[in-house]
């Protein structure tokens, strides 16, 4: 079970050729972000039932096989337990993500905590301050955990079809979010969770296998997706560059414009709330109170259901028709597919689904899939610059920008995000809590 010498390891590598393989990397410290972590050991399982655990850095084998890690990282066409983590360890991109396949197959997130053994929890509680604790947890306990993972994952691996949609998702999402996480976020000493700071930075962690597909973003109890603008949470975030700034780009009325795109409706590039307010109140100029009321009405109608009195407004008439057709397809086929990635949303997984909830799920999936495609373009553009994309939150992106690149890079990024149909608002600040509007 446990590989002890290089000759045996060489045999394993030869044996894995042309076989379906499951690989589970076990990080050295469950408290550390993968970006700043190491691999304690690696579990291998092949299609004919051969399994091995290979210590990389572990107390049971002082020498370990750390010098052989590159051979594992270069493997292709294997199934890896968590591809995003694997990429952050330096792994090859040409592998299949087990967690994404689980999500595609069962329409539910992969519950990683379910697989840890009682021994893992015992060591973690007993030695809370010991770094790289998984290098102390007995190898046989790591093996037991991996066998449990294999028990549930392997039947899926050998029976699931790797669809075009899955392959597309597998090639995009782990890599994109691994890159964003790897950029880190610079913080000042005022950041309250000191144990999350490494060399002046903290690292976000995106979880994109959610019910709707909209990523959550939290690590060790800190929610990066819900940093309050008013309570001081954002005060500690600053630029890493000596002469740099944080730039936030927000999609204006993002969901409304995405819906318009779905139904083929042309909205003005000016304020959509002003546009709809004119139709709600029958007047050209709105007071501030009427403008706010217009926003409330629009969001209530789109997320809570469209009242009959508003069906005469062309936009809402078309939206209502689209929602009804989507619901009819769901009821008839038992499945609908997300707009961009064509990921299946099955009725068997959501027995309590309603018409409006289905539309909201569908819209959040569209929001994420569309944003991800734009972020891919942004990342390709930023490869030639020092500017970093450091945070993605639903309808906004946060960048860390050196002043020498600001004008050139930001105009390019804004043009990519807007794409001629999605107006973007920009803010700049030295710290994340104090951002001011700018024009580009």
Where are these regions (language model features)?
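A glycine-rich phosphate-binding loop feature that marks nucleotide/adenosyl-phosphate handling sites
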Residues: 86-89, 169-173, 199, 207, ...
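Helical catalytic core of nucleic-acid polymerases
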Residues: 87-163, 173-183, 220, 226-355
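Polymerase palm active-site segment centered on the conserved acidic dipeptide of motif C
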Residues: 189-192, 403-440
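Catalytic palm subdomain of template-directed nucleic-acid polymerases
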Residues: 143, 178-189, 306-307, 397-412
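Conserved DEDDh/DEDDy metal-dependent 3′-5′ exonuclease domain
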Residues: 2-13, 17-159, 253
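Short glycine-rich phosphate-binding loop at a beta-alpha junction
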Residues: 74-88, 250, 308-309, 391, ...
């Amino acid at each position: 079970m446990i590989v002890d010498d290089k000759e045996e390891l060489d045999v394993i590598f030869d044996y894995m050729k042309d076989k379906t393989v499951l690989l589970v990397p076990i990080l050295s410290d469950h408290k550390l972000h993968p970006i700043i972590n190491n691999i304690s050991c690696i579990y291998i399982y092949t299609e004919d039932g051969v399994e091995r655990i290979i210590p990389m850095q572990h107390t049971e084998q002082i020498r370990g096989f750390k010098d052989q890690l590159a051979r594992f990282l270069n493997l292709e066409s294997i199934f890896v337990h968590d591809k995003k983590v694997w990429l952050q360890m330096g792994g090859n991109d040409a592998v299949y993500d087990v967690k994404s396949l689980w999500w595609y197959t069962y329409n539910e997130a992969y519950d990683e905590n379910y697989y840890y053994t009682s021994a893992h929890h015992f060591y973690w509680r007993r030695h809370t301050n010991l770094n790289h604790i998984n290098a102390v947890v007995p190898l046989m306990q790591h093996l037991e955990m991996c066998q449990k993972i294999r028990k549930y994952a392997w039947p899926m691996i050998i029976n699931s079809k790797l669809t075009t949609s899955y392959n597309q998702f597998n090639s995009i999402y782990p890599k994109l979010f691994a890159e964003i996480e790897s950029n880190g976020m610079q913080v000042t000493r005022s950041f309250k969770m000191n144990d999350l700071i490494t060399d002046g930075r903290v690292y976000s962690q995106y979880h994109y296998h959610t019910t709707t597909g909209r990523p959550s973003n939290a690590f060790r109890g800190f929610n990066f997706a819900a940093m309050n603008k008013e309570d001081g949470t954002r005060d500690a975030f600053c630029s890493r560059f000596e002469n740099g700034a944080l730039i936030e780009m927000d999609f204006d009325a993002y969901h409304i414009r995405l819906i318009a795109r779905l139904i083929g409706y042309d909205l003005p590039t000016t304020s959509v709330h002003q546009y709809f307010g004119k139709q709600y109140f029958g007047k050209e100029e709105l007071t501030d109170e009427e403008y706010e009321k217009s926003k409330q009405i629009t969001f209530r109608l789109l997320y809570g259901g469209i009242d009959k009195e508003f069906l005469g407004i062309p936009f809402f008439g078309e939206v209502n028709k689209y929602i009804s057709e989507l619901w009819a397809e769901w009821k008839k086929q038992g499945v609908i597919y997300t707009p961009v990635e064509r990921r299946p949303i099955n009725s068997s997984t959501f027995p309590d689904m309603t018409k409006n909830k289905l539309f909201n799920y569908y819209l959040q999936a569209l929001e994420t899939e569309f944003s991800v495609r734009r972020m891919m373009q942004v990342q390709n553009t930023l490869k030639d610059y020092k500017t970093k994309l450091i945070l993605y939150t639903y309808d906004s992106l946060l960048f860390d920008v050196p002043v020498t690149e600001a004008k050139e890079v930001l105009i390019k990024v804004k043009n990519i995000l807007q794409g001629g149909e999605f107006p973007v608002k920009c803010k700049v600040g030295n710290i994340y809590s104090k951002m001011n509007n700018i024009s580009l």
